Amino acid sequence: CRILRTLRADLLLQNYRKKIPRCHHPINQNNYPKKCNAIGLWEYTRTIEPAFNCRLHSILLHELLLSEGIVNRFVTCLPADSLDSDCHVVNQVWLPEIQKWAMLDSDMRAWAEDENGTPLSLAEMRERYINGQEIIYRPLLDSENNFNYYKMYWAKNLYWFISWEVTGYSREDNNPAFSNHDREIILVPKGFSGF
């Protein structure tokens, strides 16, 4: 898979995928982790619950990729409907070899590309949905996915985005290193104020 070769993270992701399964949104976490950093989340899967929701998957992958020197951030992807409480959280990963961002979904174990095999960022995915252009979803490693459901899921969750302006280890744990960096970047369509 081209994106994994580009990321230099194949072994890391293979091990990650085998050890931490997906916790589906309707179930979500029975006990939310006390520590939302790579070490705390790993311990959580060994002692409390063996599975994660999408946010926790993205936080763990974010910190693992950073430890390998791979620039990335986790992004919350939201629907337009304020009554829809379901959102999705994925990683945006910088691919220096091709000088662009790409979406990597460790929770649903997939990534997106265009018809030429170029990995797509969240913004590019959103534009393609708006313009009716094809998005090809690829399974992460050897996972089996229902991409018909996944396409519909993304169609609703690409309306607006939220991400921390500054990210790093233990970002979600009120790490003192981030005390002066508590701003979020919120990208919304013109005329929409979010919720």
Language-model features, listed with the residues they occupy:
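Hydrophobic/aromatic-rich core segments of domains that either
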Residues: I59-Q133
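A structural signal for well-ordered alpha-helical segments within the folded catalytic domains
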Residues: D10, F52-I59, E63
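Secondary-structure boundary elements
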Residues: C1-F52
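Low-complexity, Gly/Ser/Thr/Pro-rich intrinsically disordered linker/tail segments
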Residues: R128-F195
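Short His-Asn-centered micro-motif
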Residues: P50-C54, V75-C77
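Bimodal feature
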Residues: C1-R5, L11, H62, C87, ...
